[in-house]
């Protein structure tokens, strides 16, 4: 990621655009398929709607519910990240502010709608309550359930329904790869630019503020790459299970945003 990112903002923009399209595609699939399942099942939800009580045992108290705020804020994390690219925007004094407002509205509606739509195909106790489900694979578990539920709603055979779920998971894997790749390219440059180039140069060693021929702080980006690699290695060999490892990585990403 760093090797390509140091070659300039144009490289980052092209890859990020592909990632954005992948995310939009996944959300569109969720919307259309959930709507189809809801119609085929006569408006029946796999997880009954309850706006006051969470099916997750970990969110039964008011204090526990407050911990969800971290994830709610993370939904807007990308907006903060692209703030470092405001100078790359055409007519930023007008277009950037407008883009932030539109993005915030879309995220708010989309985030809330997606939570409700997952209840169409996934029941907490049957799908998400398993010990094997964690923050690292939950998207694939949900999409597999979405595909399998669609097959059942279409009265396909159990084998065909399961195969539909498998293909949904495979397509999700490709889409998530593209989405995360785009996010990593943006996050490898934008926050670093805001920290280093947004503060007095006297605070940093000259090598950290030096730009390469593409206008990128290459030395700082490579140092960042090294530090991230070290932290990942330290966490991965901490002795916890893979599930706990994925949970830690996700929580680290949320806090960092």
Name these PLM-found stretches:
Residues 1, 22, 153-173, 201, ...:
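Transmembrane-helix boundary/entry motifs in multi-pass membrane transporters
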Residues 1, 10-20, 171, 180, ...:
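Transmembrane helix-loop boundary segments of multi-pass membrane transporters
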Residues 2-5, 24-35, 224-234, 257:
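Hydrophobic core segments of alpha-helical transmembrane domains in multi-pass membrane transport
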Residues 2-3, 65-73, 171-185, 249-252:
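Hydrophobic alpha-helical transmembrane segments of multi-pass membrane proteins
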Residues 4-9, 86-87:
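Structural signal for the C-terminal ends of transmembrane alpha-helices
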Residues 17-164, 169-170:
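Helix-loop-helix junctions that connect adjacent transmembrane segments
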Residues 81-85, 163-206:
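Membrane-helix boundary/coupling elements in multi-pass transport proteins
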Residues 90-93, 102-107, 181-185, 196-239:
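Loop-to-transmembrane helix boundary motifs in multi-pass membrane proteins
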């Amino acid at each position: 990621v760093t090797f390509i990112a140091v070659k300039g903002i144009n490289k980052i923009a092209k890859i990020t655009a592909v990632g954005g399209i992948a995310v939009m595609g996944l959300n569109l699939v969720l919307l259309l398929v959930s709507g189809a399942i809801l119609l085929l099942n006569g408006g029946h939800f796999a997880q009954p709607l309850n706006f006051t009580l969470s099916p997750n045992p970990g969110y039964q108290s008011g204090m526990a519910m407050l911990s969800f705020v971290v994830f709610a804020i993370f939904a807007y994390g990308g907006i903060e990240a692209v703030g470092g690219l405001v100078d790359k925007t055409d007519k930023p004094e007008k277009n950037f502010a407008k883009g932030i407002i539109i993005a915030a509205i879309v995220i708010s509606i989309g985030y809330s709608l997606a939570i409700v739509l997952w209840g169409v195909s996934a029941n907490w106790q049957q799908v998400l309550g398993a010990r094997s489900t964690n923050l690292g694979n939950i998207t694939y578990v949900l999409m597999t359930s979405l595909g399998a539920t669609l097959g059942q709603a279409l009265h396909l055979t159990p084998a065909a329904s399961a195969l539909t779920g498998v293909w949904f998971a495979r397509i999700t894997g490709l889409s998530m790869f593209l989405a995360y790749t785009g996010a990593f390219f943006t996050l490898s440059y934008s926050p670093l630019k805001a920290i280093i180039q947004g503060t007095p140069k006297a605070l940093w060693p000259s090598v950290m503020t030096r730009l390469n021929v593409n206008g990128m702080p290459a030395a700082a980006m490579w140092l960042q790459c090294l530090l991230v690699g070290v932290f990942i290695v330290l966490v991965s060999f901490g002795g916890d299970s893979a599930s706990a490892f994925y949970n830690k990585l996700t929580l680290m990403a949320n806090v960092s945003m």
